[in-house]
Design a protein with these regions (language model features):
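Flexible beta-alpha connector loops of hexameric P-loop NTPases
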Residues: 29-37, 85-86
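Short, basic/glycine-rich phosphate-binding loops at helix/coil junctions
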Residues: 20-29
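Conserved catalytic-core segment of NTP-binding enzymes
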Residues: 43, 47-50, 54, 59-149
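P-loop NTP-binding site
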Residues: 136, 166, 170-201
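Short, conserved glycine- and acidic-residue-centered signature motifs
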Residues: 37, 41, 87, 164
Length: 201
C-alpha cells in the first residue's frame, strides 16, 4: 500500500505487488519543503509505531528542513557514507547533530567500498572510517555494478546472489538483532556464477 500525507491525514494510493507487508509513505511533491514541520513528522511516527514493526525514514542529503523532519520522530539512525574524505567529514557533522538531538543509538554503513583501491592505499578501509567517526559498524556495501543495473531495471537488489544484494540483506538482519558475519569483499564473481545469473533472468 502506498500512502500519501494530505494535510494531517494519510490516504492509500496503491499496493506493492511483490511485498505485501511493505508500506510506503512518499515525501510531499512540493517545492515548499517547510510544508511539513518536525512536530508533524514526530506525531506521524508516533502514530505509525502502533501499527508497524519498523519505520524507516530516508533522510535527504544536507542538514536543512528535510533532515530535521527525518530525525524528529527517530529513535535510532543509520549513517550512510562513502569512504571518501569529504563524505566522512559530512558524516561526522551529521553524527554530531544527531547527538545534539539526543539520538545516540547510531550505526554506520560504509557504501561503495572498493577492496582493490583499499589494498592500493587509494581508499579508506571500513576500519579507517569507523575509527574516524567513532560509531559501530552495521554494514559494508561494495561498489557493485549490479546496483546500477537493478536501479535502471527498477528491480530490488535485496535477496540477489551478488555481493551488494547479500550486503543489503545482512544489514537488514543486523538491524533486526541477528549476529551476521561480514562478507569477504575480495571474492570475485567466477564464470559459473555469471552463467547461473544469466539463467535466473
Amino acid at each position: 500500500i502506498r500512502l500519501s500525507l494530505v494535510g494531517s491525514e494519510m490516504c492509500i494510493r496503491d499496493r506493492d505487488k511483490r511485498h505485501q507487508n511493505l508500506f510506503l509513505l512518499p515525501s510531499a511533491q512540493t517545492k515548499d519543503k517547510t510544508a511539513v514541520s518536525p512536530e508533524q513528522m514526530k506525531k506521524l511516527a508516533d502514530e505509525l509505531r502502533n501499527e508497524y514493526d519498523y519505520i524507516i525514514m530516508d533522510c535527504p542529503a544536507g542538514i536543512e528542513q528535510g533532515f530535521q523532519n527525518a530525525i524528529a520522530g527517530a529513535d535510532r539512525a543509520l549513517v550512510v557514507t562513502t569512504p571518501e574524505v569529504s563524505a566522512v567529514r559530512d558524516a561526522d557533522r551529521i553524527i554530531g547533530l544527531l547527538e545534539a538531538n539526543e539520538i545516540t543509538k547510531t550505526h554506520l554503513i560504509v557504501n561503495r567500498l572498493r577492496s582493490d583501491m583499499v589494498k592500493e592505499g587509494n581508499m579508506m578501509s571500513s576500519d579507517d572510517v569507523v575509527d574516524i567517526l567513532g560509531i559501530d559498524l552495521i554494514g559494508i556495501v561494495p561498489d557493485d555494478e549490479h546496483i546500477i543495473t537493478s536501479t535502471n531495471n527498477g528491480e530490488p537488489l535485496v535477496g540477489s546472489d551478488c555481493l551488494a544484494g547479500q550486503a543489503y540483506m545482512n544489514i537488514c538482519k543486523r538491524v533486526m538483532g541477528e549476529d551476521v558475519p561480514y562478507l569477504n569483499l575480495d571474492v570475485k564473481e567466477g564464470f559459473f556464477q555469471k552463467l547461473s545469473a544469466i539463467f535466473k533472468k
